[in-house]
From Swiss-Prot:
One of its GO terms (molecular function) is ATP hydrolysis activity. Residues 15-24 have a biased composition (Polar residues). GO terms for biological process: rRNA processing. The lineage of its organism: Eukaryota, Fungi, Dikarya, Ascomycota, Saccharomycotina. A motif (Q motif) lies at residues 135-164. ATP binds at residues 181-188. The gene is DBP7. Residues 168-363 form the Helicase ATP-binding domain. Residues 75-96, 111-123, 712-728 have a biased composition (Basic and acidic residues). This is ATP-dependent RNA helicase DBP7.
């Protein structure tokens, strides 16, 4: 039988089936923890979890890099590699104590403002200069002795435009005045001269110090009060019967009471201290007050003195007895004349004017017109002869660029020791002033004012280390030191509201007065004042060649008052405004261009400033033709690294730098809401900004260190302070509260 095509089927046992049957049987595991036994039991039964590969947001394995070869052509990959930067900043764990050393010239944001090429520099006639060819002070109707003293002793030749407008008005009428004029135009003399003229004209019943107070000048800051008082002392030398006086916060009230008790005719005061004397000094007689002058009215409002001023004026009105003495002093006004001086006519100033002034006469010399032809009445203008330079600097390069600007100004200082060049640098907070003062005076000598026994003249003598560290020196000796990190001929000062009044006054006097230094090796003829806005209002500082706004102003009016310290009374001047790349660049066209004459703003490249300051002209590509001229970038980097190493070695200076950094951020966040478009704290690169303070720590660590002072002291090996005795602390706080109860806003 043929069996071809016959198929036989055999049922063989399936191995999978046998395994399934065996797997269905539970596996018993004993010993160990329950969790471990359960995991082992599940794994043996085939029910364990499958480990998934770790993936990123694009579902690609993190362990294996993505392969671009299949999706992108070779030419595209080569093009992308060519676009990559050659240098990268370290983003690892950092060095010792988690610090980072980054390059100054990498990862910087570039400026979008183009450097303006000026083919022919425009020249403007000075807008605040004395009027040449106009009538002199004799033509204004002033007292002959006063005019002779002005022209012969004080060397005033011609009045300014604002003086020519205000003086005749105060002499002829008794109307209240609202005076608006740009800074540096001579407003102080415009209201002091008519008052002195009226008091000097009383021949029948001469004015003496016992006659009472006839004029009060209210000012916002103590420095401005001291300056006006100094001008009054100079003017009254031609008529000793008229006695000026001053009452300001920070001085001893007992001494002020004694001066008031002896008699004062013209009183210069700050609002808080004057209100205190009105309440507590019975010898202060304001019944014959004829003139009330409010200088820098906009600043008085900004500092919150509106309520205090209203209270002062109400008290003066209530105790006035002018009607009883009109026959005795017939040349004086028959009612009180109020004068409000301000750089702007904003709403808050107009509100103060409506409270203080009664049917006032408005005098303004600002007739500038905008580009559209509309007259600008609400804003003051910068002096026409001022050159405004805008420097857009990356955050990391701010400190080294500031030193370069000061080096450049120091090079322009004359070689003669009699000619002195002065520069003012404005900061946003006092902590920043302290840090930069310590940074610039590093390895320098401190000075103080002393009388030479041989010549009987004052000069600046070197302060010894023991004297500088002596107890009480911080409250008595002004902060003056040489600045070898800038130049051999530079001297640096510091001024802010946290200093005592004695130090503030002596610092300003030393900065203004040309006192020779006892060190004959160096010709210290470049004086640098590091300050806050406490020195931006009304101060008439001579020979200010340059003003540097290192931190942007908080308003356009602050900008005008800052730059108004230079280019005064027709003299030329220059100012620098530091801005960061990005949204801050819009501040030029958005805010300040309208208050500057057309063509007076210069966009300056920071690299050009660094090249001029750190480039060595004697080394011009001698051996290496590829090297930059003078290797200015290497010199700038070395200068900045020296600052960083100094902070690492000096724990106190390092703490000062951290405090300055955090205070700078807080101050930056307080810009007006109308300017948040240009100054937004959220757009700051805090790491790069910390670099400009010489810090190597990341900002997050700086913030944590600022809140942990005890750990900071342990880290740098400082001894922890002993707890203060509760009784001594209570007495100290009571004395502090008593001394500051009537003091001014610590600005």
């Amino acid at each position: 039988m043929d069996d071809d095509g016959l198929l036989l089927n055999f049922a063989a046992p399936d191995s999978n089936a046998s395994s399934k049957s065996s797997a269905q049987k539970p596996v018993k595991v004993s010993g160990g923890r329950w969790k471990d036994r359960r995991k082992l039991q599940l794994s043996l039964s085939g029910r364990g979890r499958n480990k998934r590969a770790e993936t990123g947001v694009n579902k690609e394995s993190i362990a294996q890099p993505r392969d671009f070869s299949s999706s992108k052509p070779q030419s595209f990959r080569e093009e992308q590699l060519a676009k990559r930067p050659k240098y990268f900043e370290s983003r690892g764990e950092g060095g010792k104590n988690e610090t980072y050393v980054s390059s100054l010239f990498t990862s910087n944001t570039k400026s979008k403002l183009e450097n303006e090429k000026v083919e022919e520099e425009k020249t403007y006639l000075p807008s605040n200069a004395p009027m040449k060819g106009a009538d002199d002070f004799n033509g204004l109707g002033l007292n002959d002795n006063l005019v002779h003293h002005l022209t012969e002793s004080l060397r005033f030749k011609n009045p300014t435009q604002i003086q020519k407008s205000v003086i005749p008005s105060l002499l002829s009428t008794s109307r209240d005045l609202f005076v608006k004029a740009q800074t540096g135009s001579g407003k102080t003399l415009s209201f002091l001269l008519p008052i002195l003229h009226k008091l000097m004209q009383e021949k029948k019943n001469p004015i003496t110090r016992e006659s009472g107070v006839f004029a009060i000048v209210l000012v916002p800051t103590r420095e401005l009060a001291n300056q006006i008082y100094g001008v009054l002392e100079t003017l009254t030398r031609c008529h000793h019967q008229i006695v000026p006086g001053i009452v300001i916060g920070g001085e001893k009230k007992k001494s002020e009471k004694a001066r008031i008790r002896k008699g004062v005719n013209i009183l210069v005061a700050t609002p808080g201290r004057l209100a205190d004397h009105i309440e507590n000094t019975t010898s202060l007689d304001l019944s014959q007050l004829r003139y009330l002058i409010l200088d820098e009215g906009d600043r008085l409002i900004d500092l919150g003195f509106e309520e205090t001023i209203t209270k002062i004026t109400d008290t003066i009105t209530r105790c006035s007895r002018i009607s009883e003495s009109t026959q005795k002093w017939q040349g004086l006004p028959t009612k009180r004349v109020n004068v409000l001086c301000s750089a702007t006519m904003e709403n808050n100033v107009e509100k103060l004017g409506s409270i203080i002034l009664n049917n006032p006469e408005q005098i303004s010399i600002d007739t500038s017109k905008s580009r559209e032809g509309d007259e600008i009445d609400s804003k003051s203008m910068a002096p026409a002869q001022l050159t405004q330079r805008v420097v857009v600097v990356p955050a990391k390069l701010r400190l080294v660029t500031l030193s370069a600007v000061l080096k450049e100004v120091a090079k322009t200082a004359p070689t003669s020791s009699t000619e002195i060049v002065r520069t003012i640098v404005f900061f946003s907070c006092s902590d920043s002033v302290n840090f930069h003062y310590e940074a610039f005076k590093r390895n320098g000598s401190e000075f103080r004012k002393a009388r030479n026994a041989e010549t009987n003249r004052f000069e600046m003598v070197t302060v010894g280390e023991d004297e500088a560290n002596a107890e009480g020196s911080d409250t008595e000796i002004p902060k003056i030191s040489s600045a070898p990190t800038i130049s051999a001929n530079s001297v640096v000062y510091k001024l802010h509201g946290s200093l005592t009044q004695q130090v503030r006054t002596s610092t300003l006097q030393s900065f203004v007065q040309a006192v020779p230094f006892d060190n004959s090796e160096n010709n210290y003829n470049h004086l640098i004042l590091l300050c806050t806005d406490v020195a931006s209002r009304g101060l008439d500082l001579p020979n200010i060649s340059s003003v540097v706004e290192y931190d942007p102003p908080f308003s356009v009016q602050d900008h005008l008052h800052r730059i108004g310290r230079t280019a005064r009374l027709g003299n030329k001047g220059s100012s620098y405004l530091f801005l960061l790349p990005g949204i801050e660049e819009g501040y030029v066209d958005g805010k300040i261009r309208v208050v500057h004459p057309e063509g007076s703003i210069r966009i300056t490249n920071y690299e050009t400033i660094l090249q001029n300051a750190f480039g060595d002209s004697s080394e011009i590509k001698k051996s290496d033709p590829k090297s930059k001229q003078g290797k200015w970038d290497m010199h700038a980097t070395t200068w900045h690294l020296d600052i960083e190493r100094w902070l690492l070695e000096d724990a106190a200076s390092h703490e000062s730098a951290k405090q300055a950094f955090t205070s700078h951020i807080r101050a930056y966040a307080t810009h007006l809401s109308s300017e948040k478009t240009f100054f937004n704290v959220k757009t700051l690169h805090l790491g790069h900004l910390a670099k400009s303070f010489g810090l190597r720590e990341p900002p997050k660590k700086l913030g944590s260190l600022a809140t942990k002072s005890s750990s900071t002291r342990k880290e740098y090996g400082e001894k922890s302070r002993k707890l203060e005795d509760p009784r001594k602390k209570m007495l100290r706080m009571a004395k502090l509260a008593a001394s500051s109860a009537s003091s001014e806003f610590n600005y």
